Structures are given as C-alpha cells and as structure tokens.
Amino acid sequence: MKCVHILCFAVITFCWIWMLPLLIVGAVFSIPLAIITLTISILISLTLQWWFHGTILPNNVLRRWISCCPWHEWFPCNTIRIADVSVVAVHPHGVLCCGALAGIHFVPESQTVFCVAPVLFFVPVLGWCVRALGCIPARYDIMLLALRKGHSLIVVPGGVPELVMSEVGDDYKTFERSGFIRLAREAQVPIQSVFVKGECQTYDMWKAPFHVNRVHLSWKLNIPLVFPLFLGWYGTWLPKRTPLVLKTQRMESTTQEEYYSYLKRLQQEK
C-alpha cells in the first residue's frame, strides 16, 4: 500500500470508531459551557444597561468609523441630512430599515439617534455596541429625553407588525400608530416624514398563511411572527441591491388622521 492509502485508511477508521463518541462527549461537555457563557453574557448586558441607563451617544467613535463607509452606494439610495431637531418617522419598516440606516443614520456627520427594540440591547456582542452606534431603546421616556437634549430621533412607527406586512413586498402598506405624534407634540418639535420606496424589495420572504392574524398577534406580542428565512443579494443575508428612493416632508403639529393623509400624498409623489 502507498502512504496515501494508509493515511486514507487511518482517517476512515478513526472516523468510524471515534467520531460518534467524540460528538456525544463534546455535546455533553458543551452544555455547561453554553450555560456559563449565556449567564456571563446576560450579566454583562444587565450591567451595561444599568451603567449606561439614559446615556445617549450620537457621536461615538465607532459610529463615526462606520459612517465613513458609503453604505448608500450599495443599493444605491439618496441621503437625507436632518438639520433641525425633529422626530424622523420612516416608512415602511422592511426587514432591516435599510433606507433609514443607509440614507439617514449612517451618513457622515449625522447626529441622529435611532430608536430600536429594547431587547436588542441584551443580544450578546451586538447589544453591547448598539448604544455606541447612536441607538437608544424605543421607550417613551428615553425618546423624550433625547429630544429635550436636542437630538433628532429616527423612529420606524410600523415596528414589528410592519415587518410582518413586508412579506407581501408592498411599500405602500403601513401599520398606523400615533405614539410618535404625541411624542413630537410633547417635545414641541416637528415631524420629518420619510417614505422609502423599494424598502420591501430588499429581501424575499416566505409568504406564510394567516397574514392578517399574524400582523395583529405580532402587534400584541411585539414579536415578528414570520418564517425566519430572508433571501437577499444572490440568496445571502445581505440586502438586495435594489435602488431606494427616500422622499421626505416636514410636518408641524398634526393628528394621526392628518399625518397618514399627508403620508399617502408623499407616497404618490413622483
């Protein structure tokens, strides 16, 4: 037998005899390691949340470094600079809020603050960095504090229900809410409404049954009830290179009915 044959024979017999026992032993020993890692991660997340409670970091070095990358060229999309303190309401949500992130938040010299789901702050590694990226928990008191400190606030009013609605790929479907309107009124700042044409085409999603029921239940539970398979650029997790068009309109104090009436007109503009 040649050396290569002996080597092949050794590998095959090793796998045949030892692979299953090693997998079983590895699985058994990985359970305590996973529990320890999870416990440490949760403790770190809780400590950071307590330590940085109410802290707003719109100009952290990590965000400045990430903003140097021309993210808007990926799709491509136009960019919007927010000059005055305002509530920037972006529609629709889509999967990743690509228009809001690439076209407004991660733009060089942008000082906006992005409202995200509070649970993100407890995700290991990502949650430890998300505040340094200019994000705050989407809680009314913290959002109001940010506005009173002079920071423009990016909100995606449709939230989780609108993420579920993006299954159908229709940018014009919105889940109406009024909390951000009350917020702007209380802080006495205008609303900058932004419509992102093409947002729902950045990913292909599986159209599961009971769509209307899942949208309603997602709103109640604040959990996106969708099949966790998002196909982007060439089937990867990257968003598709779909051109995005950001349209914007400034609105002063308004009601929910008036706001969504203005939004429909903005959506229809060419």
Task: Describe the predicted segments one by one.
Residues V61-D84:
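A short, well-structured juxtamembrane/interface segment
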Residues M1-S45:
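Alpha-helical bilayer-embedded segments of polytopic membrane proteins, i.e.
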